[in-house]
Amino acid sequence: WIPACTGMTEFDGMPDLKLSMFAIAALFRIHFICYLPKGRLKTVRLVLAKFLLKSNALSLSDDIAMQAHTLVWFRRNLRIRDNAALSAAVKRGLPVAGVWVAQGSSEIPNPRQDWFHYQAAAALHRSLAARGVALYVVNRVEELPALATRLNVQTVIADEAYTSSEIGQDNRIWRILDEQGVAFERVNDRAIFAKAEIMGSHGAPYTDFPHYKEAWLALFRQRFGGQDAGGGCVEIFQTASVEMPSFPAWNGQQDMVSAQRGGEDEADKQWRQFEENIGFYPIMKDFPARKGTSRLSAYLSAGCISPRVLATEAAGQGADAWLDNLIRRDFYQQLAYHRARIEPESAAVSATFSDDLTECWRQGKTGFPLIDAAMRSLKSSGWLHPALRSLTAEFLCGILHQPSEHGIVWFAEQQTDFDPALNVGNWQTAARNACRHSIDIIQTARRLDPDGTFVRRHIPELAHLPVNLVHTPWLASSEIDAHGYPLPVVAP
């Protein structure tokens, strides 16, 4: 083994060593990993593979496994079209493999989102397999370095992380991979513009949305100019791969109910349906009972569809009102990365926590029909209309005077489209708004649900009430039965 350490690249003059794979692996680990510089490690691996092949100690499948690979770590970019990480891997010219970590990085359990991401990853597995690319599934992120060693990976490429927990995880994985001589690269695949592409005049991140939006639009026009983002499917058709592993069966909660199904094709179908009526979005977006929004948030959260593609296609149709949602999404992503200081809630908003009040809010039993209908809808389907998200958040902070942190956690547990950066950003905005102005909950309810359709859909106890009482059932005469629907927990 000494010639290999000193630079020898052929084993022609060496005796035919009859070592088992286990013995060779042990010898390799003990004598090479401990003493070789990182730059030598991959050379020795390839030299070892050559020797094993010449001595017939390695099968054809093992030979493929010993080839150098580029590994794409799919996280919140579970798609092929306009996938920057996959494109970067293909450009390297080495065989490409993928990996998906079944246990996500979120510290808050969310079985409904886990199920959605599982469906999306299964669809990605099929799409990659059709192109000759293997997608491996590991249970925990700590298993990724071992897979990289097994596949003789030169570089791991992943979508850029934004939150502190994800960045911390990336740093831990990077250190392990670095010790193995494996590079770890990250590319912008989650937002339209990378986290530091749009900065203020003094190099500081924008903390107010109007100024950020102005800068975002200027850069968008400069870079895309209304043209397509170039988001076609990656041209990758590999004729050989390490293997084609099967996709594991779902081992999570069995009774999951989701309003949508995960996957790139499902995302594209949802976008095309909305695209047909995108011109009506400014008129219909504030009515929860109508299908006036895109319902793409879960697909964007999982990365089943590219925000770059959506932005260029929406801009090409003059859909500025809807494009505003994608800009705000970028805004909250970069805020999460920069950990920009957002105005804290006032002492009046963050009053003493009441578990009873917060639990009534969670379960849709506050006695305010539209709030309760919204919270019941969220719990049953995992999705909530955007207008109702801000209303229920402002209700918790401004009317019940409860800390936003409890709402942040509850939404994180319930939403199929949960995104940590957007969740925190939206809640902090709602808490700030609740501090600055009072909410007329009744007038707002009548504006958003004028005929009570949404309330009746989710609160059957009130389905029999007329329009003038459906949002104020406490005003009904004693002869009208509310079927156990509670009185308001605070004075209307």
Across the structure, where does each feature detected by a protein language model lie?
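A cross-taxon signal for low-complexity, glycine/charged-rich
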Residues: 7-8, 13, 29-32, 36, ...
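Glycine/tryptophan-enriched, flexible segments
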Residues: 50, 56, 182, 203-352, ...
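C-terminal substrate/ligand-recognition segments
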Residues: 333, 362-402
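N-terminal, intrinsically disordered charge-dense segments
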Residues: 13-29, 39, 43, 48
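Trp/Phe/Arg-rich N-terminal binding region typifying the photolyase-homology
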Residues: 51, 56, 60, 64-224, ...
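Active/binding-pocket-proximal capping segment
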Residues: 343, 349-352, 390-435
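Conserved, well-ordered active-site substructure
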Residues: 410, 414-463, 467
